[in-house]
Amino acid sequence: MPAMNLKYKFGLVNSAGRYLTAEKFGGKVNASGATLKARQVWILEQEESSTISYLKAPSGNFLSADKNGNVYCSVEDRTEDADTGFEIELQPDGKWALKNVSHQRYLACNGEELICSESSTSNPSANWTVQLAIHPQVCMKNVQHQRYAHLKTSEEGEDSVVVDELVPWGADSTLTLVYLGKGKYGLEAFNGKFVQTDGQLAGTANEQTQFTLIFTSGHLVLRDNNGRHLGVDSGTRVLKSSKPGLTKANYFILEDSCPQGAFEFGGKYASLKQGEDVSFKLLVDEDIEDTETFQLEFVETDKYAIRVCDPKKNSRDAKFWKTVAAGIQANGNSKDQTDCQFSVEYNGNDMHVRAPGGKYVSVRDNGHLFLQDSPKDFIFRLLNRPKLVLKCPHGFVGMKEGKAEVACNRSNFDVFTVTYKEGGYTIQDSCGKYWSCDDSSRIVLGEAAGTFFFEFHELSKFAIRAESNGMLIKGEQSGLFTANGSEVSKDTLWEF
């Protein structure tokens, strides 16, 4: 199964605190952005085994510089214009200097105007701070070991991030890249602690948890303040800074973290404890294990393949729900198989699952699944987002400055705690305040906890429906975050 590798999206901030900005028309580019919004987001493209990088604007055009130092963003095909190639030179403080390959000059600023005529990096305006613009919650795979990082507790009770999972399964496999300022990032584990250079976990960020991001041949490298690189200990597989030098053990790939959860119906969870037959056997007051956890892998809008976990976690070969004459079995070999693709529909907090032939998945009295004409009300309980970060085209979701309201145009994200409650979820900020709807349907923070439902529709995007009025939360460019959306659209979908 091909991995869902993430594109590296970022903003570039100059010495005056302004972002590299691509205007919508005329191929114009400048350094006028005060915050990281859509026009300030660039995609990094690199070729395998090449040091040349290309910066792609939201319009799809590429950044370029001519021999006179003029900077444009009008080239549609980078292969037809050598002026689009840049070399990224990492500075001692972690900032980037961007040297145009054709003319050997550095990208800099004169006020808001961009110029590419500097012959050295001594001018502060030729140094750029990098701020990631991808969703920060990811799965992280090591290139050399072809294993995923996850939080693990040793027999002695010590927590560490270990790179030994063939398949990222469970909340412990989701890591968060936290921006710490001045171009530095921290790697936060599921328990809220940060990875240190020595492999131990720290409760708060410090100098030993700061890393500079380096992109090479499409891979990510994290360099610590001592010039060493985060890697995998050959014996313990613990994530820690390695010896000097750079090898494939220091190369990582960031992948999308798909939603994983349990299907609930009639006081029981769907389970694979019976083998390949999917059946509702486990009572809801029992512990949910890997055999009750299923992953929604996006196929197209409102359609998913439902992946199951290999109980032994010793195989990369994916298995999926598959329709058979007797019902549903977990022996599908590919998400591309038509009989492994299920449509999802929503009714309040209930999910209806429609099989490829148009019939709905239902449950017999003995707990086994079969297909029928009418829908059955399931609840999909999301398990691998106990900590939630939300992103939309206008920015990240977080507390509005100076007010007990939630806004959706923040440059930096807030982390919210999600608690499952009777088919819905409560959402709490870092200060212990809960989301709820006020009389104007705005999402506010307070002591009273509102209930919300998640509806999965797109790749790593869901809609959030408020129980209080039955409406979807809608975001606006101004940051307004209100439960007044009546239909699923780009304004009511949230990247999670």
Curated annotation (Swiss-Prot):
Task: Extract one GO cellular component term from the record.
Answer: actin cytoskeleton
From the UniProt record, list the coiled-coil ranges.
none
An MF annotation (GO) of this entry? actin filament binding
Give the Pfam families listed for this entry: Fascin
The UniProt entry, under CDD domains, shows: beta-trefoil_FSCN_rpt1, beta-trefoil_FSCN_rpt2, beta-trefoil_FSCN_rpt4
Q: Which UniProt keywords apply?
A: Actin-binding, Cytoplasm, Cytoskeleton
**GO BP terms, alphabetized:** actin cytoskeleton organization; actin filament bundle assembly; cell migration; establishment or maintenance of cell polarity
Q: Which family does it belong to?
A: Belongs to the fascin family.
State the function annotated in the UniProt record.
Acts as an actin bundling protein.
Q: What is this protein called?
A: Fascin
